[in-house]
Swiss-Prot record:
It comes from Halorhodospira halophila (strain DSM 244 / SL1) (Ectothiorhodospira halophila (strain DSM 244 / SL1)). (2S)-2-hydroxy-3-oxobutyl phosphate binds at residues 86-87, 128. This is 6,7-dimethyl-8-ribityllumazine synthase. Keywords: Riboflavin biosynthesis, Transferase. GO terms for molecular function: 6,7-dimethyl-8-ribityllumazine synthase activity. Its EC number is 2.5.1.78.
Length: 156
């Protein structure tokens, strides 16, 4: 059986858009740093990285869709942090963000990596933004790199 899968290879010609929420910026800025650092370490030049900020995670899908439809990037990385508050509001934001980002990817055909944290506490968010549980922004960047390589293989 032939197996085709993306590799974590240097993609010096690939362009990546990081679409990130400003809300919970203490956390999201660390996700951005992790994603950008990972891309640079894998050979992506600074001029091939674009950061687009939106007010919050609920607004991520529209910006992701526009970037993907415009052909501005070979992959988009969605970054945000949805943290439980005193109501169920976080559940609605997280669900719609997830659905919207997935729809943007499927509608555009451009890989979108999902680096949006959905957590119960600020402490959990901090753990996932570069401490105990790694950096989910960096993990999303690795996924984006692999998907760009895979899409190129599938087009060949």
């Amino acid at each position: 059986m032939q197996v085709t899968e993306g590799q974590l290879v240097a993609l010096q010609d690939a362009r990546f858009a990081l679409v990130a929420a400003r809300f919970n910026d203490l956390i999201v800025d660390r996700l951005i740093d992790g994603a950008a650092d990972t891309l640079r370490r894998h050979g992506v030049p600074e001029e091939h990285l674009e950061l687009i900020r939106v007010p919050g995670s609920f607004e991520l899908p529209l910006a992701v869709q526009r970037v993907a439809d415009a052909g501005r990037a070979d992959a988009v990385i969605a970054l945000g942090a949805v943290i439980r508050g005193g109501t169920d509001h976080h559940q609605y934001v997280a669900a719609e963000c997830t659905k919207g980002v997935a729809q943007a990817m499927m509608g555009s055909g451009v890989p979108v990596s999902y680096g949006v944290l959905t957590v119960e506490t600020v402490e959990q968010a901090i753990e996932r933004a570069g401490t105990k549980a790694g950096n989910k922004g960096a993990e999303a960047a690795l996924s984006a790199l692999e998907m760009v390589d895979l899409m190129r293989q599938l087009e060949a």
